[in-house]
Amino acid sequence: MTTIERITTPRIRIFDTTLRDGEQSPGCSMSPPQKLVMARALDELGVDIIETGFPASSQSDRDAMALIGRELRRPSLSLAVLSRCLQADIETSARALEAAANPRLHVFLSTSPLHREHKLRMTREQVLESVRKHVSLARSYIDDVEFSAEDATRTELDYLIEVSRAAISAGATTINLPDTVGFTTPEEIREMFQQVIAGVADVPNAANVIFSAHCHNDLGLAVANSLAAIEGGARQVECTVNGIGERAGNCSLEEIAMVLKVRQAFYEQDSSINTPRIVGTSQLLQRLVGMPVQRNKAIVGANAFAHESGIHQHGMLRHRGTYEIMRPEDVGWEDSQMVLGRHSGRAAVEARLRALGFWLEEDELKLVFEQFKGLCEQQRVVTDADLQTLMQGGSNAQGYRLASMTISDVGSRANALVELSDPDGNRVAETAQGDGPVDALFGALSAATGVQLMLDSYHVHSVGIGADARGEANLSVRHEGVEYDGTGTSKDIIEASALAWLDVANRLLRQRQANAASTTEAPAPATA
């Protein structure tokens, strides 16, 4: 699809940065194989651009780009990487993009007076010269170049126009005006886009340039500001699944996509998002990074389509439109949960796993199906929660796995004995005492794995149907000052708690392995 075709189509381009900006959220880092799994889901979701990472920062991001580029070849999908306005960064990014069928090189530089003085220590003219030089360099490698004016919403309007003109003249095909610190308001950002677009109109090829919004959620306005930017002329929105990202996060992909769908008559724009895949994609990300969304999260929260008020329930029974502006099935929720059993075949199990966001290779599917049939011998039905439990057990295959545990009372205290299989298949056993079974359990797990976690919050609840219901444990912990979330599911809530603890511990161990494999010192995180 050409640039001219893109700009004349009444459609908003969805630039997903879950794998780059979203991953910068504390505790949300992903390994290259995990990024590939997430990228597959984003491809099925129908995003237009996937930003895979920041190649100059680590070998891990370069490996992820190579994996994703080799597999995802959809003609309408672009793969992007981020680069500072530095020659070495741009050259590294260009090499990383060699695997992509449709590459985009995304370069950024701060433009606000605060950043120019304290971060860059550069004058206005020096920033302009750097933009000209490095956008031109990027364009010499890649035809599709995006330039981001970091902290655009705190940049002088006349200077922002000047920088945008310079970037377009140097060959930029997309101009991104980020609200880097979530400072602006809808009225301000709408006016900013209108003024900048008008201010570059006479630059050659400006009519073919896409203007993009990248809004952070520090004041809770990321989605509202992105919509206002669309009203001001933006035709690309940069966002993340579940709104994850630095500090308070980014514009939420699922929210922006559903606003454009539900209120299409107002905005006269739509997106290419395959909306019935939204919930599955959201749940996949929650599992990969261990960060559940709050129950009242729009679109993907567990309560998004729940009605408890008697008045609301009565209205819903009369007509769904009384209290629902969209159907649950339009975003991937189901009115009734699909139930599998002993007579279900492998194709049905595979289809349900894909709907839940799990894409398995043939050998992986064979193993999970064998586990599924074993579960069918123990209970009448297998629900979505049961399938997620099976997949969670498989996710620990390369880390510590729970072999057995024993909890007993020792006077006023509890004693826990745990036996684990370590990543090499060896058995490790440790005991610990604590002020209750969970405290003792976590102490024993810490001793067995060598991982120290500080518990912030912990709760359990039931998932599943009737007598086959299982307990799900959710915990939030800290490790070296960074927050992590873990989830575990089992018939026994203490075992579920152990699985939740190991969920975090195994993720930390995988991160250590990925960091050890990296051969390049990481620069400061990008925030554009």
UniProtKB/Swiss-Prot annotation:
List the GO cellular component terms: cytosol
Provide any one GO MF term from the record: manganese ion binding
Q: Where does this protein hold Mn(2+)?
A: 21, 214, 216, 250
Q: Mostly located where? A: cytoplasm
Where does the record place the Pyruvate carboxyltransferase domain? 12-279
Q: So what does this thing catalyse?
A: 3-methyl-2-oxobutanoate + acetyl-CoA + H2O = (2S)-2-isopropylmalate + CoA + H(+)
Q: Where in the cell is it found?
A: Cytoplasm
Cofactor names from the entry are: Mn(2+)
Give the signal sequence positions.
none
Q: Which SMART domains match?
A: LeuA_dimer
InterPro entries (UniProt xref): 2-IPM_HCS-like, 2-isopropylmalate_synth_dimer, AIPM/Hcit_synth_CS, Aldolase_TIM, LeuA/HCS_post-cat, LeuA_allosteric_dom_sf, LeuA_bact_synth, PYR_CT
Give the first-level EC class, as a single word: transferase
Q: Does the keyword Secreted apply?
A: no
Q: Which UniProt keywords apply?
A: Amino-acid biosynthesis, Branched-chain amino acid biosynthesis, Cytoplasm, Leucine biosynthesis, Manganese, Metal-binding, Transferase
Q: In which pathway does it act?
A: Amino-acid biosynthesis; L-leucine biosynthesis; L-leucine from 3-methyl-2-oxobutanoate: step 1/4
Residue ranges of the region described as Regulatory domain: 401-528
Q: Name one GO biological process term.
A: L-leucine biosynthetic process
EC assignment: the record states: 2.3.3.13
Description of how the protein assembles with itself and partners = Homodimer.
The function of this protein is:
Catalyzes the condensation of the acetyl group of acetyl-CoA with 3-methyl-2-oxobutanoate (2-ketoisovalerate) to form 3-carboxy-3-hydroxy-4-methylpentanoate (2-isopropylmalate).
Concerning its family, UniProt says: Belongs to the alpha-IPM synthase/homocitrate synthase family. LeuA type 1 subfamily.
* Protein name as annotated: 2-isopropylmalate synthase
